UniProtKB/Swiss-Prot annotation:
The lineage of its organism: Eukaryota, Metazoa, Chordata, Craniata, Vertebrata. It is an enzyme of class 3 (hydrolase). Binds 2 Zn(2+) per subunit. N-glycosylation is required for protein maturation, secretion and phosphodiesterase activity. Gene3D superfamilies: 3.60.21.10. GO terms for cellular component: extracellular exosome; extracellular space. The gene is SMPDL3A. It comes from Homo sapiens (Human). Cyclic-nucleotide phosphodiesterase that acts as a negative regulator of innate immunity by mediating degradation of 2',3'-cGAMP, thereby inhibiting the cGAS-STING signaling. Specifically linearizes 2',3'-cGAMP into 2'5'-bond pGpA and further hydrolyzes pGpA to produce GpA. Also has in vitro nucleotide phosphodiesterase activity with nucleoside triphosphates, such as ATP. Has in vitro activity with p-nitrophenyl-TMP. Has lower activity with nucleoside diphosphates, and no activity with nucleoside monophosphates. Has in vitro activity with CDP-choline, giving rise to CMP and phosphocholine. It is found in: Secreted. Monomer. Homodimer; homodimerizes following 2',3'-cGAMP-binding. Belongs to the acid sphingomyelinase family. It comes from the Eukaryota. Residues 1-22 form the signal peptide. This is Cyclic GMP-AMP phosphodiesterase SMPDL3A. Detected in blood serum. Detected in macrophages (at protein level).
Length: 453
């Protein structure tokens, strides 16, 4: 009940205390692109904590700290807490007032906070998702938004089912303004859908429920095709191929290997291999892939079975700055803007924006800034697989300045003094360039790891 009461309070008060929504904007040289360039926003991992409030007892600032002392709580949050509503609102206000024209937005899941299971309920989870949805709809009434469910967008967390549920039905009703009847139907049944972009009729968004493949999800243990999503995905991609459409894949839990760990996939390995096979088969149709979940900023390049790069994948950093007490690093809040060619939907560039949380709390105003422009920062031509693969090759150079920048951006410029030793670098680079188990293992063995594993 405490979370429900706090949820109501945060919504009633936040609209009246929106201090200092100062907007940077696009860099000099005028990054407001000509109409020949299409744009879309990507936001992820909002993780609203309705209980967040400033109090002298730092163990009670937020439920998401789980009793730990909040380190330096301010109006826009704390690194041991999930997002206060004021932080989330500042992100969307920045987007609204940035001056950037966008065709649509993708929103890749995880609205509720990281709190113990007994502190949430199905109704509370639905209430949080409802709040985030209505916030977006009120600020962007004419923008088509494509959501994907996250592992926390359910109760109990991670246990997203293979059949219809109260949550699936609720989000299907909430997201009707953005989706057609067929998309709503599959969303109700399994938490996934495909939908054409209204402003770009030859571009289709496929929103996958990759939480079905997530390790902690016991609802899908020993199932070869949970909710028949693989079968549906292949059929949808095949239809897009026949109809000469291009597809952007969006989901919460990404494919591939976690860049901060050794030999750990973000989802169960069997499902990862199956998805990789499908993505390789239809790489000519898929023009980009976009994920969340890790809270970090990373790229991946999918290669075909001959080793040629065929797909670009982007994992976006979270809006929430939360970390556990055991973690040394976290991320500043981040949101991003992609640019694409509206003729063929090839990805051209990405502008990453961030909020320096320490500075925002100190000044009492949220000044979102441009962190980097991907092509300019790394001196590459575009965001095509060949360009990203070439960049990853540059990362392998000893003391690569390119990689030093990449690793700082991995944490959204949270701590520029952070370093990545040889083993850390191996995990990062192999995760970028190798998404399947055989090539990933070969990468670690041949290039970096001296011992057998």
């Amino acid at each position: 009940m405490a979370l429900v009461r706090a949820l109501v309070c945060c919504l009633l008060t936040a609209w009246h205390c929106r201090s200092g929504l100062g907007l940077p904007v696009a860099p000099a040289g005028g990054r407001n692109p000509p109409p020949a360039i299409g744009q879309f926003w990507h936001v992820t991992d909002l993780h609203l904590d309705p209980t967040y409030h400033i109090t002298d007892d730092h163990t009670k600032v937020c439920a998401s700290s789980k009793g730990a002392n909040a380190s330096n709580p301010g109006p826009f949050g704390d690194v041991l807490c999930d997002s206060p509503y004021q932080l989330i609102l500042s992100a969307f206000d920045f987007i609204k007032n940035s001056g950037q024209e966008a065709s649509f937005m993708i929103w890749t899941g995880d609205s509720p906070p990281h709190v113990p299971v007994p502190e949430l309920s199905t109704d509370t989870v639905i209430n949080v998702i409802t709040n985030m949805t209505t916030t977006i709809q009120s600020l962007f009434p004419n923008l088509q938004v494509f959501p994907a469910l996250g592992n926390h967008d359910y109760w109990p967390q991670d246990q997203l089912p293979v059949v219809t549920s109260k949550v699936y039905n609720a989000v299907a009703n909430l997201w009707k303004p953005w989706l057609d009847e067929e998309a709503i139907s599959t969303l109700r049944k399994g938490g996934f859908y495909s939908q054409k972009v209204t402003t770009n009729p030859n571009l289709r968004i496929i929103s996958l429920n990759t939480n079905l493949y997530y390790g902690p999800n016991i609802m899908t243990l020993n199932k070869t095709d949970p909710a028949n999503q693989f079968e549906w995905l292949e059929s949808t991609l095949n239809n897009s191929q026949q109809n000469k459409e291009k597809v952007y894949i969006i989901a919460h839990v990404p494919v591939g290997y976690l860049p901060s760990s050794q030999n750990i996939t973000a989802m169960r390995e069997y499902y990862n291999e199956k998805l990789i096979d499908i993505f390789q088969k239809y790489s000519d149709v898929i023009a980009g892939q976009f994920y969340g979940h890790t809270h970090r900023d990373s790229i991946m390049v999918l290669s075909d079975k001959k080793g040629s790069p065929v797909n670009s994948l982007f994992v976006a950093p979270a809006v929430t700055p939360v970390k556990s007490v055991l973690e040394k690093q976290t991320n500043n809040p981040g949101i991003r803007l992609f640019q694409y060619d509206p003729r063929d939907y090839k990805l051209l560039d990405m502008l990453q924006y961030y909020l320096n949380l320490t500075e925002a709390n100190l000044k009492g105003e949220s000044i979102w800034k441009l962190e980097y422009i991907l092509t300019q920062t790394y001196d590459i031509e575009d965001l095509q697989p060949e360009s990203l693969y070439g960049l990853a090759k540059q990362f392998t150079i000893l003391d690569s300045k390119q990689f030093i920048k990449y690793y700082n951006y991995f944490f959204v410029s949270y701590d520029s003094s952070v370093t990545c030793d040889k083993t850390c670098k191996a995990f990062q680079i192999c995760a970028i360039m190798n998404l399947d188990n055989i090539s990933y293992a070969d990468c670690l063995k041949q290039l970096y790891i001296k011992h057998n594993y």
